[in-house]
Amino acid sequence: MDMNMEKIFEDSVPCRVRAKRGCATHPRSIAERAAMMMIRSGGSGGSGGVSCQDFGNQAKKDCSHMRCRTCCKSRGFECSTHVRSTWVPATKRRERQQQLATVQPQTQLPRGESVPKRHRENLPATSSSLVCTRIPFHSGICHCNVKYLFMCIYICLLLYGREIYNEMQAAFL
């Protein structure tokens, strides 16, 4: 390709493509970044989030490279917004928990012990917890003196001239 054709090709290719090929200092690229920074800080009425230029992931709002943490780290960008992480290794978390446990009074159960389970109430075999009741449609809600109330409601619909039956069940404690 001669120089004139190369220049025409470069002008016809969007600046984002050139920036990925290493032309991040191109004036159009800088202008695009400045415009994006104004959109982020200003007030287009969206959610305010910025997408990563490479993969579309959520980018940090203060990232000057407009990239997600993974892209900034993998491309070696010096980015102050992605330096600090909230993730703490498990060993450090355990050390911190042990330090807090020695400072605070021992109100928790020792490790490995659990709260004892409550015993079930054994009901006599003669009592029945299942009650079948036919609820008339016009009477409203039926009141029963049992632990559980099971309701079964049948619904009949007319759809395209055919009756369709549906059943709804509910259990109330």
UniProtKB/Swiss-Prot annotation:
The record's annotation in InterPro entries points to: SHI, Znf_LRP1
Keyword annotations for this protein, in alphabetical order, are: Activator, Auxin biosynthesis, Auxin signaling pathway, Developmental protein, DNA-binding, Metal-binding, Nucleus, Zinc
Where does the protein end up?
Nucleus
Identify the main location.
nucleus
User: According to the lineage, what is the superkingdom?
Assistant: Eukaryota
Q: Which GO terms describe its molecular function?
A: DNA binding; DNA-binding transcription factor activity; metal ion binding
Q: Where is this region: Disordered?
A: 100-121
Please tell me one Gene Ontology term that the record gives under cellular component.
nucleus
Q: Which family does it belong to?
A: Belongs to the SHI protein family.
User: Tell me, what does this protein do in biology?
Assistant: Transcription activator that binds DNA on 5'-ACTCTAC-3' and promotes auxin homeostasis-regulating gene expression (e.g. YUC genes), as well as genes affecting stamen development, cell expansion and timing of flowering. Synergistically with other SHI-related proteins, regulates gynoecium, stamen and leaf development in a dose-dependent manner, controlling apical-basal patterning. Promotes style and stigma formation, and influence vascular development during gynoecium development. May also have a role in the formation and/or maintenance of the shoot apical meristem (SAM).
Name of the protein in question? Protein SHI RELATED SEQUENCE 8
- What is the originating organism of this protein? Arabidopsis thaliana
